[in-house]
Amino acid sequence: DNSATTRTFPEVAELMTKIMCEDYGNPSSLHMKGVEAEKYLRYAKETLARILKVEERELLFTSGGTESDNMALIGCALANCRRGNHLITTQIEHPAILQTMRYLETQGYRVTYLPVDPCGRIRLEDLRRAMTPETILVSIMHTNNEIGALQPIEEAGALIKQMNPDTLFHVDAVQGFGKSRIYPKKMHIDLLSVSGHKIHGPKGVGLLYVGERVKIQPIVFGGGQQQNLRSGTENVPGIAGLAKAAEMLYSHFDEDHARLCACKRRFIEGVRELDQVKVNGLLPDAPYGEGTAAHIVSVSFAGVRSEVLLHALEDKGIYV
């Protein structure tokens, strides 16, 4: 069940152990231990900025995807409230987005929840109609974690900027980063959320890309670390582990992606030989999941409760 979490790469665990046991300094300290720790932060920023093709100063480290999502939505809503009070998202977002949007509704913000088509994708025309002069932020997930739908992110970003260049575009890429090539500047993305444990990195660490033109207000206060935007002593082992995992994944991305696509096709061919089975979320004229996430397949079995099937597979060492 690699959509829920992933096994940490041994190389990542080894690097983190070295930092925790040897290079354990506080990166804000001026002595040698602090300088050594700060080098790992620099390595992480350089690595992740290169992968995303962004500037190092545009990256903030968080405690995970949920905090990144909260910081993006609440921080931008607070910082841009004088421009408007309207937000847009979709009906199939992760709870980290949906629950945050519901909280913002209690604070006086209006939220539009876009429907999706039978394949789980938004319709750009719905987005166009939902946009108003009061829209300050749009948040759309890159990859749906249940059916593997890939949203038309680049097209949505272009549409948003065409209609109102000041409207911010946030993308929850927790399920997409490491499995797709994502370039925020090319795709008109202002804010991007990433999680370490979804890419064979550690739990408890995440990333938020914040474009340099974005006004955002901190939601965590303290010692002023990370440009006064996210206070707290940086989780150096976790941050370095996140960067190492991303570096490893993207160093052989094309081969891994091709292998996953082949596995997905083989799996779909196999389950279609069974009776009363439906593969969900397939695009028209794409019988083997083309145009959807290579690492996710959603299957329904008529007359079988999902929990019963889950435990039956669990007995065979298969976790879904």
Language-model features: where?
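Pyridoxal 5′-phosphate
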Residues: 2-320
